Amino acid sequence: MDIAHDLQSIAAQEHALVFPHFDADTAWQLGAYLHEIAKARGLALAIDIRSFGQPLFFSLLEGATPDNVDWARRKGNTVAHFRRSSYAVGLKLQQSNATLADKHGLPVSDYAAHGGAFPLIAKGTGVIGSVTVSGLPQRADHELVVEALCAHLGHDYSKLALAKA
């Protein structure tokens, strides 16, 4: 895995995956789609979609644990703080051999710089919330969210997917 290349790819994902508008119905549609593909693939996940300060969708699939719920909360907090994908934040920290606590004074009890939370970006508004999954390795969590966003927004996932690790 090339961190610099992944960071460029994530920046392209964040630039492309913009909603023309986003509301509670959009959150429900996106969350239901994530739930269905996770269920079809037999994935044990927590799925959390929220605007900042307000939950919009939550689902816990068979086999997911309270730890997955807490990881989702912490990854979502990271997006809220940095307005970037939690995976991008983690990769940037990895590049500088730092942690959220070292570099930003953020407690690990409330923030996680691991893949799986992606900013919800509305055209003309900017980052309005996050969509998060937790239950897979962090790169796979990130990619599942990107795959679902591509499907919802009509983008070709193969053009936005991270390079194979």
From Swiss-Prot:
Alphabetical list of InterPro entries matching this protein: PduO/GlcC-like (IPR005624), PduO/GlcC-like_sf (IPR038084), YBR137W-like (IPR010371)
SUPFAM superfamilies xrefs: GlcG-like (SSF143744)
Source organism superkingdom: Bacteria
Entry similarity comment: Belongs to the UPF0303 family.
HAMAP family cross-referenced by the UniProt entry: UPF0303
Protein name from the UniProt record: UPF0303 protein Bphy_1660
Organism: Paraburkholderia phymatum (strain DSM 17167 / CIP 108236 / LMG 21445 / STM815)
